[in-house]
């Protein structure tokens, strides 16, 4: 279980919690809690796509999360409200609803005090420092400085403290956990009630997270509580169809972080794990170690969907499966060979049984003496079990190991000795990857309880052998007997196509070598048979080949069983449903695009009309200005005075008397102004010529009334001449 954080411990002890960063506090308090004022004015530029800090519609509105004085939240961070309408954004209980509202983008949960910035984002940042997937408002931390401790509910803190102290307060040994875990437990119980097969660990190993969840994402809790996958990172490839190692894919996992499976170019045909779910539920790792929660608290909330063992019995079952399958399948393979009934009555019956016992004893010695032999023996067991089915008495033939090839040197403890012994056993083609993996773990000193070298693969019931084409592309043979196997493949295939009339002679040693080579060169990845020799081996048995059987055990019928047909029908219905959903989505998108195109055309038309109106108004303005200018020029050409005259009045006899008096007074004022101007002009001109300005002073009178030319020609002052004498 997760440990109590510092902020949570502080809240539990009664001390004030750690102060939030300004950016975190702003988002927790204000993000999508107020309506955008620019949107009401139709001016918000962040509406499409919707990246606005405030909400535009009610279904985008987020309630502000609060932690009350009693230590509880105003609404749960995990349990969704069943009354909330996602289309209208309305809840009958209003803001006082104690449950989570599934708003657009699930903002109430992502930006809750319990979850906001408490986890690291898996996506990178761009040049501006924004998340390339979620943009500016990413609810996950980008870097250690952006992380914040979660603020927990008092009930969750009490449950965590009880788990840490080993005090289980719930009934039947179940602790009083937070509401989110309780909701997951309720979902698991509902799934087990609907389909009891999930209680079987073999069914969980073969089907967990291999099919897409039929429920909509918003109506499922997802996570470990749902046995179906919801995204590519949650998906697990079906181990019955795909064969891959328990090693993480280097293209997907970097360090401790699992990336997107789409990063791998190999896709589903990749030989490595693409997710944590694929690795934990891999047949080599599943139920191979004890569950940590069961070890510490005696309770696991994941129940049957846990990838780790809950009891010592399940651990023992995992370790015994390979040996049990090896012994049972070896016996069935021997008893199902043609001519075995005849040899039972022969004198060599004891030697045959002794040979079989010696094979098993040598395998046991090999697995005990050599540190890397456990993976080899378990791979052989799993391959034999998978080829014959789990718990079925199928007469399908598998060639057995020759007795002369099995003795090993118990003192050989080096890699060279192990590989050399494997070559002597004709096992060089089986599980080379597990040898490399075990060697790496021995070099690194991984001897803990979670070491993969000590885990045995789990038999997957109903697993189908691979086709020759898949085997040739995924498993490369390095044995010196591979060329011999290939040379023998032609006649063996031809003999397999025809019913055998008598047992083939297996007396010569080359034939024995070919049989052993063909048997163990077919053991591909993780010890699962996957070559054409599985089909060839059917020629030595009166029963059909396992490659023609689709059920968990070989049968005389070549048609698939009802479960397989039901599964195919479900997949077909699911594909049809997806196609219908895609068609509906495409129709909606097409209608939206058509509406946007119509709006764009209308906007362009309105802009064109407005531009033409503007051009017309400018043209009219220029015409009016030109007409005014022309009238002014005509008035100047007529030479009319600015003073009002009688010519503009027309017949003055028709003018009323008051207006005539007003006109008279105005004309008098104008006349006086004209007289004043005339007097001033005359006072400046010469009295004699009245053309030039006066400038000469006459003597002795000192009058300045004549210009210089007139003063020279006139001896007397004209001003004094016109004046009477003073006496």
Curated annotation (Swiss-Prot):
GO terms for biological process: protein ubiquitination. Ubiquitous. The keyword Ubl conjugation applies. A zinc finger (C3H1-type) spans 75-104, 115-145, 243-277, 285-313. GO terms for molecular function: transferase activity; zinc ion binding. It holds the Pfam family zf-CCCH_UNK-like_4th. It comes from the Eukaryota. Its main location: cytoplasm. Residues 330-339 have a biased composition (Polar residues). Keywords: Cytoplasm, Metal-binding, Nucleus, Repeat, Transferase, Ubl conjugation, Ubl conjugation pathway, Zinc, Zinc-finger. One of its GO terms (cellular component) is cytosol. It is an enzyme of class 2 (transferase). A zinc finger (RING-type) spans 686-721. Transmembrane segments: none annotated. Pathway: Protein modification; protein ubiquitination. Belongs to the unkempt family. May participate in a protein complex showing an E3 ligase activity regulated by Rac1. Ubiquitination is directed towards itself and possibly other substrates, such as Baf60b/Smarcd2. Intrinsic E3 ligase activity has not been proven. This is Putative E3 ubiquitin-protein ligase UNKL. It comes from Mus musculus. The gene is Unkl.
